[in-house]
From Swiss-Prot:
Molecular function (Gene Ontology), one example: virus receptor activity
Lineage: Eukaryota, Metazoa, Chordata, Craniata, Vertebrata
Protein's gene: Xpr1
Protein's organism: Mus spretus (Western Mediterranean mouse)
Protein name as catalogued: Solute carrier family 53 member 1
Chain spans, region Important for inositol polyphosphate binding: 158-165
Cytoplasmic side: 1-228, 297-309, 384-388, 472, 535-553, 627-696
């Protein structure tokens, strides 16, 4: 692998600009070589002066890069030392509390199930769990910084070696010895000490001296491009997708020959439409994940996932394919119910019952950690006023806004099975009384309108909670206003629908109000999409016209196409209103909803790419590469104490009590190395040391 590719694959995306600009140096060298005057047409002194002038400029650029790297490394190292001191302080506090409450001086307390613990013990258990997670994330940040150190040194060595080869000199090697090999970022070994200290703390204080267990917790995933999925996962993805495509073709033929009347067709469509949208969403989310990884958008950090264990795009494709097969088989079974002994109404219940069980399955199988993460996130979304709102919380609520048809179809299914289904008819999903008009998919009783407003309500209260936490009217109250327009749109749509059915004279008034609020809502959301969520139309965009100063995806055309797509689909309701207002044929609204619901899921899929890109660029601006997890917040006095601590000989002091560590193995930054640390640590990221210039 060429070093440029290796560097690109292994850098920390949020620190991209802080690495040595290896490609720029290469371009300088090749450009100087191409533009050099020929000895055949000019004298040798002119050639020497040309290269001397170039070398002066080249080494000045090297000095600037070296200063940049030294500064960034020093800042990150100081930040790591402060963070380590904070974690030490929090660990000491937890140990002191435990000692006072139970008389146990270490974490080797008797093992009891969490549900048997007292309230104080539960709090302590949570603190220890948070500390383990915090040390794990901190360890990852140390490895990233060590990787930064190694990559930059190798980059300087490679480019200076190339300089000497092209210019046929040894001044590059001399410059490296004089400047790079004595640079603070290379000579400073405190990062290795911090790594050893962290391993010792986690092993001795958090894992009862079990080093194997500690290192398993601290294990850092391979730094670089996404690792290939296991062969069996790839096989299952191909198998499931192939079967799903084949079953869809079969469904198409079966639908032509098996469906008979509208009374049979539309209950099936409404019940199975939501399942299809969910499968489409999972598949497109897999494409999102693949695109983020390829472009270097760190979605793992943005969603605050566990970097050591999370779903890849192949896993999402596998889940979508598997559920897609079940969906097709269930629908096919409904088509062939007349020749089956199982009543038709059993198949939808079995399908969605399995989906629910798959999600809440308590056994540690079938992506248990990812499912548990999703369940916790759903709980936080539906209890938004009572929790601080993070990115993953409002991202998921935004997805629910595009999946509102699923909630409406779920409401329809519950209503249909409860009030309309003719249970003694096993061959078709028929209403109990064919003479009575269907009411479950209408707004007559207001329940459907309420269900349709639930996703917008969740985002609305999330915005209010964020305003409460930050006291910033912009953007949070303004964003809440955006979601409030949905309430008016749905309300007047429901009033128009019910008044139209009853031939009221004021129907046209509600129609115009519906159209008015649709226009307001679409313009509001479109502007917010482009300007706030995507960060486009930046006045400092420079050559990226109508975009922003920095873009991640390689082609500008992606952004322009996304803008056009967002405008079209944000105003797709105009087609729906035009058709429903000018025709009185039954089920026209259902047909349009069935067509436009997948398009809305696709619009959200495109939105996801640029929303996460914008969040990623914010992280890059803050050089935030790992989660910042803390057990106890620091007040101003604590922060001052931690800053002063770095110059004290006795290390960290407890912030509740003015005392030092009293354990045999002090974990002060200045303590002697442990005997167990004399062994070489297998934590460094390997840098390919290829001297073959063809590979550089």
């Amino acid at each position: 692998m060429k070093f440029a590719e290796h560097l690109s694959a292994h850098i920390t995306p949020e620190w991209r600009k802080q690495y040595t600009q290896y490609e720029a140096f290469k371009d300088m060298l090749y450009s100087a070589q191409d533009q050099a005057p020929s000895v055949e047409v000019t004298d040798e002194d002119t050639v020497k002066r040309y290269f001397a002038k170039f070398e002066e400029k080249f080494f000045q650029t090297c000095e600037k890069e070296l200063a940049k790297i030294n500064t960034f490394y020093s800042e990150k190292l100081a930040e790591a030392q402060r963070r380590f001191a904070t974690l030490q302080n929090e660990l000491q506090s937890s140990l002191d509390v435990q000692k006072e409450s139970s008389g146990v001086t270490t974490l080797r307390q008797r093992r009891k199930p969490v549900f048997h613990l007292s309230h104080e013990e539960r709090v302590q258990h949570r603190n220890i769990k948070d500390l383990k997670l915090a040390f794990s994330e901190f360890y990852l940040s140390l490895i990233l910084l060590q990787n930064y150190q190694n990559l930059n040194f190798t980059g300087f060595r490679k480019i200076l070696k190339k300089h000497d080869k092209i210019l046929e000199t040894s001044r590059g090697a001399d410059w490296r010895v004089i400047h790079v090999e004595v640079a603070p970022f290379y000579t400073c070994k405190k990062i290795n000490q911090l790594i050893s200290e962290t391993e010792a703390v986690v092993t001795n204080e958090l894992e009862d001296g079990d080093r194997q267990k500690a290192m398993k917790r601290l294990r850092v995933p391979p730094l670089g491009a996404a690792q290939p999925a296991p062969a069996w996962t790839t096989f299952r993805v191909g198998l499931f997708c192939g079967i799903f495509i084949g079953l869809n073709i079969t469904l198409g033929f079966a639908a032509v020959f098996k469906l008979e009347t509208d009374r049979t067709v539309w209950p099936l469509i409404r019940i199975y439409r939501g399942g299809f949208l969910l499968i489409e969403f999972l598949f497109l989310l897999g494409i999102n994940t693949y695109g983020w990884r390829q472009a270097g958008v760190n979605h793992v950090l943005i969603f605050e996932l566990n970097p050591r264990n999370n779903l890849s795009h192949q896993h999402l494709f596998e889940i979508a394919g598997f559920l897609g097969i079940l969906w097709c088989l269930s629908l096919l079974a409904c088509f062939f119910a007349p020749i089956s002994i199982i009543p038709i109404y059993v198949y939808p219940l079995a399908l969605y019952g399995f989906m629910v069980f798959f999600l809440i399955n308590p056994t540690k199988t079938f992506y248990y950690k990812s499912r548990f993460w999703l369940l916790k996130l759903l709980f936080r979304v539906f209890t938004a006023p009572f929790h601080k709102v993070g990115f993953a919380d409002f991202w998921l609520a935004d997805q629910l806004n595009s999946l509102s048809v699923i909630l409406m179809d779920l409401e329809y299914m519950i209503c249909f099975y409860s009030f309309e289904l003719k249970w003694d008819e096993s061959k078709g999903l028929l209403p109990n009384d064919p003479q009575e008009p269907e009411f479950c998919h209408k707004y007559s009783y207001g329940v459907r309108a309420i269900v349709q407003c639930i996703p917008a309500w969740l985002r609305f209260i999330q915005c209010l909670r964020r305003y409460r936490d930050t006291r910033r009217a912009f953007p949070h109250l303004v964003n809440a206003g955006k979601y409030s327009t949905t309430f008016f749109t749905v309300t007047f749509a429901a009033l128009y629908s019910t008044h139209k059915e009853q031939n009221h004279s004021d129907t046209v008034v509600f129609f115009y109000l519906w159209v008015f609020f649709c226009i307001i809502s679409s313009c509001y959301t479109l502007i917010w999409d482009l300007k706030m969520d995507w960060g486009l139309f930046d006045k400092n965009a420079g050559e990226n016209t109508f975009l922003r100063e920095e873009i991640v995806y390689p082609q500008k055309a992606y952004y322009y196409c996304a803008i056009i797509e967002d405008v079209i689909l944000r105003f797709a309701w105009t087609i729906q209103i035009s058709i429903t207002a000018t025709t009185f044929k039954p089920h026209v609204g259902d047909i349009i909803a069935t067509v436009f619901a997948p398009l809305e899921v696709f619009r959200r899929f495109v939105w996801n790419f640029f929303r996460l890109e914008n969040e990623h660029l914010d992280n890059c601006g803050e050089f935030r590469a790992v989660r910042d997890i803390s057990v106890a917040p620091l007040n101003a006095d604590d922060q001052t104490l931690l800053e002063q601590m770095m110059d004290q000989e006795d290390g960290v002091r407890n912030r509740q009590k003015n005392r030092s560590w009293k354990y045999n193995q002090s974990i002060s930054l200045r303590r002697p190395r442990l005997a167990s640390q004399s062994k070489a640590r297998d934590t460094k990221v390997l840098i390919e040391d290829t001297d073959d210039e063809a590979n550089t």
